[in-house]
């Protein structure tokens, strides 16, 4: 969606400084189509992979104008986002607290078409660039002090974030 907004509306795109090269596609830390096809024997994986491909999941375009979200820029944005680096899904992945809401991105999800259950959890390991690091990063989220979680996939979760982290790491 960020690619579309940037191209269509010239929307500025900000992310953690460590994620900027990834957003610009200087490199790509994403599951490969070959790795997905190796999972085709699993229920739902082939259908999901085909749907994602039709929705542009194979597009490798970056966002050339991506800029680092510095504290100075964050101060000028609605909600004044505060960065919580959560590397693992990608090496520069970052979650943000905005207006007392944790926007976790892919650090923690509450549902996914390939997940076996709903509720706080980590993505299947093949979707993380460094799965052990992704799991360690969850501890940082537990300190967010918010009661609302917006995940990268799944429904909004309301409750102590420390509880969400416990469920995700169980």
Residue positions per predicted region:
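C-terminal/domain-terminus segments
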Residues: 41-45, 149-170
């Amino acid at each position: 969606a960020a690619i579309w907004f940037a191209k269509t509306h010239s929307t500025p795109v900000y992310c953690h400084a460590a994620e900027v090269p990834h957003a610009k596609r200087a490199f790509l830390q994403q599951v490969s189509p070959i790795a997905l096809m190796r999972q085709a024997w699993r229920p739902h994986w082939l259908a999901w992979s085909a749907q994602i491909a039709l929705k542009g999941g194979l597009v490798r375009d970056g966002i050339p104008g991506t800029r680092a979200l510095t504290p100075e820029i964050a101060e000028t944005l609605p909600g004044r986002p505060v960065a919580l680096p959560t590397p693992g899904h990608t090496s520069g992945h970052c979650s943000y607290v905005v207006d007392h809401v944790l926007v976790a991105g892919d650090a923690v999800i509450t549902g996914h078409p390939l997940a076996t259950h709903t509720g706080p959890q980590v993505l299947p390991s093949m979707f993380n660039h460094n799965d052990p690091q992704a799991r360690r990063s969850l501890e940082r989220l537990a300190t967010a002090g918010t009661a609302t979680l917006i995940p990268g996939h799944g429904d909004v979760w309301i409750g102590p974030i420390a509880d969400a982290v416990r469920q995700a790491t169980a």
